[in-house]
């Protein structure tokens, strides 16, 4: 009787052992295949609305990258300041917690001082002049400026020209700005420009600006027409005065922590 029980237990053990080995082999094969064909996800954050042309361009970039990499690399986009303000996103890149971001050159100047040049009013003759600078040697040097801070510039976005918009009166000449509280980006050059024009520069996050205008914290701001429209700031500000005082490009930035992990082929994609 005991012999039969032991024999039965041994047979069950052998069956269980065989099943364990079988499932282990299957699991090993699955993991091996996964390691051979990993999908690298690029985490990209920005502060714009999903209806903005820049966001749509990023979606297109993801489609193209997916084709070029044959599905091995994709972009996961976090719009609308989901991961923080532009400066906060740059700081996430610096510690490797985020892979890519799009920021205004005005904000990036805190990490790349040479970009302050874009804060000078009426610097460019026209768009042709601007693009010649951005696409040439000067633009290349400006993109490299922030690498010592773990931020690698890989390209510019044309963000249009900035003009003043206000709640209660149009800005037809510099004296019209005197005494007004004008929202500016986190930029020394923007702060100084508005101050020199006689207004009170007030740094406010883009995501908080609508409420600040509504509650009278500031009397106006300055930005390009698409941003003015898509943010619905026209609901609060009656006047958009087209003076196009600056043309500050946006910059696409990648964390050097992420960049240095890529192969040469992946960098080409």
Regions found by a protein language model. Give the residues of each.
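Short, low-complexity disordered leader/linker segments with a strong preference
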Residues: 1-41
């Amino acid at each position: 009787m005991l012999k039969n029980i032991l024999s039965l237990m041994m047979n069950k053990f052998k069956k269980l052992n065989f099943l364990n080995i079988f499932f282990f082999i299957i699991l090993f094969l699955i993991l091996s295949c996964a390691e051979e064909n990993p999908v690298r996800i690029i985490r990209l954050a920005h502060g714009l609305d999903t209806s903005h042309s820049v966001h749509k361009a990023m979606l297109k970039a993801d489609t193209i990258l997916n084709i070029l990499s044959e599905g091995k690399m994709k972009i996961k986009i976090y719009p609308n300041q989901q991961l923080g303000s532009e400066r906060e996103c740059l700081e996430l890149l610096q510690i490797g917690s985020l892979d890519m971001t799009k920021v205004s050159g005005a904000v990036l100047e805190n990490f790349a001082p040479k970009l302050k040049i874009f804060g000078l009013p009426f610097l460019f003759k026209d768009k042709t002049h601007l693009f010649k600078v951005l696409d040439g040697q000067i633009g290349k040097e400006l993109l490299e400026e922030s690498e010592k801070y773990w931020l690698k510039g890989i390209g510019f976005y044309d963000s249009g020209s900035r003009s003043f918009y206000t709640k209660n009166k149009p800005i037809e000449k510099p004296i019209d700005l005197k005494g007004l509280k004008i929202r500016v980006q986190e930029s020394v050059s923007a702060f100084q420009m508005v101050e020199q024009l006689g207004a009170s520069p007030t740094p406010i996050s883009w995501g908080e600006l609508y409420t600040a205008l509504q509650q009278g914290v500031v009397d106006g701001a300055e930005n390009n027409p698409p941003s003015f429209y898509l943010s619905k700031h026209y609901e609060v500000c009656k006047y958009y005065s087209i003076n196009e005082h600056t043309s500050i490009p946006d910059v696409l930035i990648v964390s050097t922590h992420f960049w240095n992990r890529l192969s040469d082929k992946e960098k080409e994609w």
